[in-house]
Swiss-Prot record:
One of its GO terms (molecular function) is RNA binding. The keyword RNA-binding applies. This is RNA silencing suppressor p19. GO terms for cellular component: virion component. Homodimer.
Amino acid sequence: MERAIQGNDAREQANSERWDGGSGGTTSPFKLPDESPSWTEWRLHNDETNSNQDNPLGFKESWGFGKVVFKRYLRYDRTEASLHRVLGSWTGDSVNYAASRFFGFDQIGCTYSIRFRGVSITVSGGSRTLQHLCEMAIRSKQELLQLAPIEVESNVSRGCPEGTETFEKESE
């Protein structure tokens, strides 16, 4: 059964901490099934005292069309093969097809949201701009997943601007 949720605010639902999901349905924009960790696996990787911490095994994403929201949790281990797999979790065609099931004569709001390692990005627009919204969403997803937060954090915490560390190693 598809995870379609009724609600007034797609962004609020896209930022929810625990996602459960089922296998894909015919109206879903997603091509991959939900890969949410089991409860035991979730507890192994999370500190229960810090409810704002993301599970390090993957990321959350959602597509919302009006009041209907489709959510997915996808596993991502930051390898090239994993990146290629999750970038194909939806396409412009699959989003257009799913969205067309909810379009009437009026324009509806469409929202894409992704959350990875504490960073959330939400892109929204009207149904008439869905193609542009898809392009912005895939670009945002690709940039967010290709960031190396550990490397950036280590340079910032040492007070070194990016690239300084490389120069010091070469001059030794």
